[in-house]
């Protein structure tokens, strides 16, 4: 299904070799002040990050309604496969949201990483905590994009009848 959809693949070790060949030391570079990633977006790389982001966005969209996100977070291909098989076989689960990361620990534990997953998870969490934006809807760049579609505020989007129907499902 993906033939022709992927041009190249580059892992962290290969990227590290490119930086080394070009004499680029990332730790010596000045931080970019244009980074507008939300806390949730920054946490995607570790197990539980997607669930956290979804929960914060859902609560941002419907602040007056308590929506209990019961996430089941699994990592590793075998665990993901097991959860999918269990669901397909009709096994009950209390979760209403499933997050499956193919790599152990999430992307931070992927193949050819250059630091161990535990250390990478801590770095990802620290990076996330540095964000002053909780959700994408608190990001001025996202609001500019929504404006291009004729949506001037989150409240306006939430008053859209189709969106209300989608979010009102139990």
Residue ranges and their predicted role:
Residues 1-170:
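Iron-sulfur-associated redox domains of electron-transfer enzymes in respiratory
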């Amino acid at each position: 299904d993906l033939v022709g959809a992927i041009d190249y693949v580059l892992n962290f070790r290969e990227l590290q070799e490119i930086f080394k060949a070009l004499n680029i030391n990332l730790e010596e570079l000045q931080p970019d002040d244009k980074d507008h990633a939300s806390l949730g977006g920054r946490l995607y790389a570790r197990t539980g990050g997607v669930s956290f982001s979804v929960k914060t966005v859902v609560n941002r969209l419907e602040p007056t309604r308590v929506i209990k996100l019961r996430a089941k977070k699994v990592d590793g291909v075998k665990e993901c496969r097991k959860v999918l098989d269990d669901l397909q076989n009709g096994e009950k689960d209390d979760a209403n949201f499933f997050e499956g990361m193919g790599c152990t620990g999430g992307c931070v534990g992927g193949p050819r990483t250059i630091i161990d997953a535990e250390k990478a998870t801590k770095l990802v969490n620290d990076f996330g905590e540095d964000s002053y934006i909780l959700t994408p809807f608190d990001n001025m760049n996202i609001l500019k994009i929504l404006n291009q579609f004729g949506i001037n505020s989150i409240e306006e989007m939430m008053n859209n009848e189709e969106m209300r129907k989608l979010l009102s499902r139990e």
